[in-house]
Amino acid sequence: IVLYLSPSDYHRVHSPVTGTILAKIHLLGRTYPVNEFGLKHMSKVLSRNERLITYMGHLYGILSLVKVGAMNVSSIKYTNSLATHLNKGDELAYFEFGSTVVLLIENGAFEFLQELCIGTQVRVGEPLGYWGAGFQK
């Protein structure tokens, strides 16, 4: 799941699950734009820009939250850098200005809502789909 944050969006990242923080990695990189133009014209921009990656173990497996810095706004901060456990909805990190969040989920662990399509604007607390066997809410 790629969630682009425009300058007018909310710039805080909340945990999508209750779970344990397994690892945190800060990868230095470029700060190319990650807007529609940047994604279209810059090869692998989401893996070339600066990233702050959080790996979390949860009831249905492991996920990675990749916070991607962008041109002029590569300022990604953990809300509580010492946290080892988060509840679903807890604030994890924030951008001091807009950028992008990439959520990597194990295959088969999550089912997206059928009405969710590319370009759909989502807000904090709105579901993207369902976790686990039988895809329970």
Predicted regions and their residues:
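Contiguous, well-folded functional domains in the mature portion of proteins
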Residues: 1-137
